[in-house]
Regions:
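A conserved active-site cap/scaffold subdomain adjacent to cofactor or substrate pockets
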Residues: 12-59, 66
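A glycine-rich phosphate-binding loop feature that marks nucleotide/adenosyl-phosphate handling sites
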Residues: 33, 67-73, 162-166
């Protein structure tokens, strides 16, 4: 890898290398692929999801984790996938199949963004229970995905978990199976942008 800009190896680069190179094998990597990967997976999918949901929750849920919720089928379908896949995830980690691990996280991020878009909580302001439930579900998904991302990008995940006043000691893989881990009524904190897009060089 010969970067256009000289810089030290950082956490974002590690994420890219783990995604692109199978353990023990060679990989085809490039600066362009790195930039596309970071911009797509981390800046657009993970970082943008966090910012969108937080901003909506602060504006429409008094800046708190919603208390009155009632899960519907769409909510449980996406929430339960994490617990349903827990043993498979553990197995892939134990066998150092980190490509699968990253792919699972990326697919989960796509599903999370699709869930929030499809549910359209901004159109549910006359149904506060439904609005609250969508927001709570989205926050739980962010929490679950953050727990999964922690071994790969720990520093960035700890920044994201400040949303919920959670820290390193709160992160346990088995807790991705819990659908009501977050404490209802607790305050939600604003966070800085997690990942700035990498601007491509034109030279």
């Amino acid at each position: 890898l010969r970067p256009r800009r000289q810089r030290q190896m950082c956490i974002r680069d590690r994420y890219y290398l783990i995604k692109e190179v199978s353990f023990g094998n060679d990989g085809n990597i490039s600066q362009d692929k790195l930039e596309d990967c970071i911009n797509s997976d981390l800046a657009n999918n993970y970082g943008n999801l966090c910012q969108r949901v937080i901003a909506f929750a602060i504006k429409n849920c008094d800046g708190k984790i919603p208390e009155k919720i009632k899960f519907e089928e769409d909510d449980l379908n996406i929430l339960n996938k994490f617990g349903d896949n827990l043993e498979n995830i553990r197995s892939k980690i134990d066998h150092q199949n980190l490509n699968f691990y990253i792919d699972y996280i990326v697919n989960s991020l796509f599903e999370a963004n699709k869930y929030f878009n499809d549910q359209e909580p901004w159109k549910k302001k006359d149904d506060i229970i439904r609005l609250n439930t969508i927001v709570f579900t989205a926050l739980e998904i962010i929490r679950k995905i953050s727990f999964l991302l922690y071994p790969i990008i720990p520093g960035s995940v700890l920044k994201a978990l400040k949303i919920f006043n959670l820290g390193e000691n709160d992160i346990k893989l088995e807790d991705i199976s819990k659908n009501e881990f977050l404490i209802k009524g607790n305050s939600i904190n604003k966070i800085d942008i997690l990942f700035k897009k990498i601007e491509k060089d034109n030279d």
